[in-house]
Amino acid sequence: GLDALRPPADMGIDVVSLNLKQQLEHPGMAPETFSFQVKTAVTNVSEAADRPGAIATVEFKLKQSEVDLLACSRDRALFCYVYNYEADSLTDAFEAPFICFWLDGTLLEKVRSGGAFFRKEGEPKLTLACQLRKPKHEYGHWHAVVVDEKGSKVDGGYLGVVGGSGYPADDEADHYSVVGYLKYARSCSGVAEKSDSLTQ
């Protein structure tokens, strides 16, 4: 139900989503605006048939100004897409060809305070490192963890599991879909309840 717009210049935001159509159809509906930055990474992690479990670290590069902009508000979020050279090694319960996870502005500020962003020697941009982990046990699910420069989980860095209901994220949000982000952001702002009452 949101309209997506792409800012004309490199402002640190890739996509702005607005509920303009819903406001026209329901004049009493509160306006919603969400801003997204999208980053991608590639990995070749896979789980060997005779050796269950896997782990890989992926890195995303952001300008200091991008982090500052995103960390200002919960209605801004960083979406990280990880593509894999190895077919099906990162598929979730819905056979997705890649893993995607998000961190909203509040969580970005929290992990930043915990040392999540660091600058490598000779690089102008900040590095955000995330580990993709698959437990060794039979029923384990892939999950993403934000880590510091030494590879240790930062406060708030556990994002829950992909395609599973157990072991939720530290904030109990679904960090692996756009729908999960919108649901979480709206529940925190109280917009969801207002929108439901207007569309009934």
For the regions a protein language model found, what residue spans apply to each?
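Mixed-charge (Asp/Glu-Lys/Arg
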Residues: 1-11, 17-200
